[in-house]
Amino acid sequence: MLRVMMLGLRGFPGVGVEAHAEHLCELLRELDCDVEVVVRSAYVPGDRGNDWKGVHYLRIWSPGSRALETIVHSFLGVLAAAWRRPDVLHVQAIGPALMVPLARALGLRVVVTHHGADYEREKWGRFAKAMLRIGEAWGMRFCNRRIVISRTIRNLVRNKYGLESNVIPNGVDLPELPTSTSALERFGLTPGRYVLTVSRMVPEKRHKDLLAAYATAKLNGWKLVLIGAIDRPDAYTSEVVALARATPGAVLAGFQTGLSLRELYAHAGLFVLPSSHEGLPIALLEALSYGLPVLASDIPAHLEIGLDEKHYFALGDVQALATRLELFARMRLSQAQRESTRRWVADRYEWHTVVEQTVRVYRSAMEQSASRRRLLDRFLSPLSW
């Protein structure tokens, strides 16, 4: 059995990196992996238990400061990994990768997944961005094996560091389409008559662009539903909440999971992701897995998914987005068209393929480590002189 420890996560369930790791960990168990996830105790209270779908939790404290949370938690997580000695320490994202040199110095085999250039996110200040750049450099240079979730990130790593990576994208499952509408009734929604976006409430998700475009567009009774957690209230979240409350038809649905989230996806008329920065957006893949028509900003991460040109609009162009909203609101997809979309995304981003490729990277990291150890033993052996 392969023992894997996962580092760099707040906990499950979640969005973004957490959603990626949540699916990955669950399926790793099916390939005979024993998975332990280092989580932040503030996000996973003890009353949730120590296991999640067969995945073990290791709760470790982290400070409340946004600037220090990841660094301190990752440092403590590496020390815990050094004590527990997993076969592979899998570090998720470039922030926690700041601790990769320490992990290697402590004799751990390390795989790093690069989910995107987080130093380009608008929410971070100068110091945090500097730490993220160092985390990227140290993580890529000192790990045993590196995974990137898109060709765009592979090219970034290749051009900046002269290093090759394993491209393993985010995956997506084909969900069963619920017919129930309890969540819609709770928010006063009509099936097929609302625009949906799902993301954390942070500046690079560009909620204000979407709200402005929705207010401009003539959508004849459609509503706009914003799903996503507010990690920490700040000036941006206050602006978005105030703007949403001042926009007739806008609905702040907060964090959703389980059946409620599935219902809100399944019955949406259109999904929109206007982000200025993404790695490979799971929320967009999930929208496609429900067969939804989608609109996305024309950033490289979205373009790489390979949708038809009509599904993209220029980043930050509110009027262009409003025009597309009106156009797509008039479209009606048949059930056959929705099923075609579902099959298309499932063929390209199948989760079991993602997990099998990840396990191969783990075993490659272990073989590399064993090979280096044999070389060192041969060099140090008196018989070799």
Set out the residue ranges of the language-model regions.
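Nucleotide-activated donor-binding/catalytic signature segment of Leloir-type glycosyltransferases, i.e.
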Residues: 237-259
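Aromatic "clamp/platform" in nucleotide-sugar-dependent glycosyltransferases that forms part
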Residues: 276
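Glycosyltransferase donor-sugar binding loop
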Residues: 41-43, 172, 198, 223-238, ...
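Conserved donor-binding/catalytic core segment of Leloir-type glycosyltransferases
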Residues: 5, 188-216, 225
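Conserved acidic donor-binding segment of nucleotide-sugar-dependent glycosyltransferases
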Residues: 311-319, 327-332
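Membrane-proximal helix-turn-helix segments that form the acceptor-binding/catalytic region
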Residues: 79-82, 129-145, 240
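Short alpha-helical donor nucleotide-sugar binding micro-motif in glycosyltransferases
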Residues: 255-256, 263-268
